[in-house]
Amino acid sequence: MSYSETQLTALAKNNPKELIRIITSPNSDVHALTFGAEILGGEVADESLVLPALRQLLRHVNAVVREGAMIGVSAFYMEKKPPQDVLDRLKKMSTDDPSPACKDLANSLLEDYNK
């Protein structure tokens, strides 16, 4: 099933566990995964819900989904650094990710978190 950004945002606000189920499901489309990760990081405040989903999506096979997960990390961790394992994953992505856009975004996030 495909979801609009409006639907994903409504889920984040009203039923974040359902949003997480959707974006961690292997059958979800790239659009739902990407925008769902971004929305999750920006709309849901419970780290115990957000962090496991973003950790999973940072390792997704699709570069667009990984980029969305990084945007979600950036949105969720605006006021503090992410956990060390997420920083380690970003560091690995900044050098080893096959996508130049993902490498650049990972580098940018690491620079921001090291200020």
Predicted regions and their residues:
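Structural detector for internal amphipathic alpha-helices that build alpha-solenoid repeat scaffolds
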Residues: M1-A12, H31-A45, E67-K81, P100-K115
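A generic structural signal for ordered secondary structure
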Residues: E5, H60, L90-M93, D97, ...
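Amphipathic alpha-helical scaffolding segments comprising HEAT/armadillo-like alpha-solenoid repeats
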Residues: A10-T24, A45-R59, K81-S94
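A short, compositionally biased N-terminal segment around positions ~18-40 that is enriched
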Residues: E18-E38
